[in-house]
């Protein structure tokens, strides 16, 4: 029997990219999934009996609570895992070219929404005395030289929240970890408009980006499925003593 058989997991950003790859893999191993996304449900999972979908904007005040209420309605009272995958990029803006809108939107999607979802699931996990949360960061969560200031700050903040939650609830059977993908080809970059990017800031990071781009040209690039494998490991019992970890998945890009 799979280690994920019948566990209940909430996956945000499940309509594409890492979220879709993770939901697909989890379902293949017997998990029951509530997928959440601002976009419509992925056609590839529409007919799966263990996949339920909720469309919604996680930055809206009531959405995080509605997510948990929907999960309980669909699958009963348990929530075994929360995978905070949904995220957006900024315009690679430096602090002196940053708009209020981009700052507030990045913080809302990448930091506030995951924290509010953790706030909603923690009481259920405390009652169960078990549960695993994994937050998806980025190379920019541990570096100042790979993205704009808003995205970088939001992902650094999420790593701090991850560590705090891990320490606070470690004696109650609840784990909280993070993974930091680097250079995964998903729709997150394509969703932003290149004409609005801060070209000067991007130029200062070009050598960092080029160092990683060479891996993909040699067939060594990181794929969404690679991230999914680690996420599913972290919500399984095989990782039961891994708590508060920040795990890079970038073929050593994070060492520079």
Curated annotation (Swiss-Prot):
<feature type="binding site">
    <location>
        <position position="155"/>
    </location>
    <ligand>
        <name>NADP(+)</name>
    </ligand>
</feature>
<feature type="active site" description="Lowers pKa of active site Tyr">
    <location>
        <position position="155"/>
    </location>
</feature>
<feature type="binding site">
    <location>
        <position position="57"/>
    </location>
    <ligand>
        <name>NADP(+)</name>
    </ligand>
</feature>
<feature type="binding site">
    <location>
        <position position="151"/>
    </location>
    <ligand>
        <name>NADP(+)</name>
    </ligand>
</feature>
<keyword id="KW-0560">Oxidoreductase</keyword>
<feature type="binding site">
    <location>
        <position position="119"/>
    </location>
    <ligand>
        <name>NADP(+)</name>
    </ligand>
</feature>
<dbReference type="GO" id="GO:0016491">
    <property type="term" value="F:oxidoreductase activity"/>
</dbReference>
<dbReference type="InterPro" id="IPR051122">
    <property type="entry name" value="SDR_superfamily_enzyme"/>
</dbReference>
<dbReference type="InterPro" id="IPR002347">
    <property type="entry name" value="SDR_fam"/>
</dbReference>
<comment type="pathway">
    <text>Secondary metabolite biosynthesis; terpenoid biosynthesis.</text>
</comment>
<comment type="similarity">
    <text>Belongs to the short-chain dehydrogenases/reductases (SDR) family.</text>
</comment>
<feature type="active site" description="Proton acceptor">
    <location>
        <position position="151"/>
    </location>
</feature>
<feature type="binding site">
    <location>
        <position position="184"/>
    </location>
    <ligand>
        <name>NADP(+)</name>
    </ligand>
</feature>
<dbReference type="GO" id="GO:0016114">
    <property type="term" value="P:terpenoid biosynthetic process"/>
</dbReference>
<dbReference type="InterPro" id="IPR036291">
    <property type="entry name" value="NAD(P)-bd_dom_sf"/>
</dbReference>
<keyword id="KW-0521">NADP</keyword>
<dbReference type="Pfam" id="PF00106">
    <property type="entry name" value="adh_short"/>
</dbReference>
<protein>
    <recommendedName>
        <fullName>Short chain dehydrogenase adrF</fullName>
        <ecNumber>1.1.1.-</ecNumber>
    </recommendedName>
</protein>
<feature type="binding site">
    <location>
        <position position="11"/>
    </location>
    <ligand>
        <name>NADP(+)</name>
    </ligand>
</feature>
<comment type="function">
    <text>Short chain dehydrogenase; part of the gene cluster that mediates the biosynthesis of andrastins, meroterpenoid compounds that exhibit inhibitory activity against ras farnesyltransferase, suggesting that they could be promising leads for antitumor agents. The first step of the pathway is the synthesis of 3,5-dimethylorsellinic acid (DMOA) by the polyketide synthase adrD via condensation of one acetyl-CoA starter unit with 3 malonyl-CoA units and 2 methylations. DMAO is then converted to farnesyl-DMAO by the prenyltransferase adrG.</text>
</comment>
């Amino acid at each position: 029997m799979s280690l994920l058989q019948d566990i209940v997991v909430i996956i945000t950003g499940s309509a594409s990219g890492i979220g879709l790859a993770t939901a697909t893999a989890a379902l293949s191993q017997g998990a029951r999934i509530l997928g959440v996304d601002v976009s419509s449900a992925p056609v590839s999972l529409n007919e799966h009996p263990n996949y339920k979908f909720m469309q919604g904007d996680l930055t809206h005040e009531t959405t995080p609570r509605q997510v948990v209420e929907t999960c309980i309605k669909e699958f009963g009272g348990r929530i075994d895992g929360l995978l905070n995958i949904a995220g957006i990029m900024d315009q690679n803006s430096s602090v002196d070219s940053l708009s209020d809108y981009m700052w507030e939107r990045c913080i809302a999607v990448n930091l506030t929404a995951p924290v509010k979802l953790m706030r909603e699931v923690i009481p259920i996990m405390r009652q169960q005395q078990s549960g695993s949360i994994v937050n998806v960061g980025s190379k920019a969560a541990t570096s100042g030289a790979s993205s704009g200031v808003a995205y970088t700050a939001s992902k650094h903040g999420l790593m701090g929240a991850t560590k705090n939650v891990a320490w606070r609830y470690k004696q109650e059977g609840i784990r909280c970890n993070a993974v930091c993908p680097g250079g995964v080809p998903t729709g997150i970059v394509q969703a932003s408009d290149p004409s609005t990017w801060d070209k000067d800031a991007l130029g200062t990071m070009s050598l960092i980006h080029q160092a990683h781009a060479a891996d993909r040209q040699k067939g060594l690039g990181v794929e969404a499925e690679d991230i999914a494998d680690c996420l599913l490991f972290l919500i399984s019992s095989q990782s039961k003593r891994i708590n508060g970890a920040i795990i890079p998945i970038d073929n050593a890009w994070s060492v520079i």
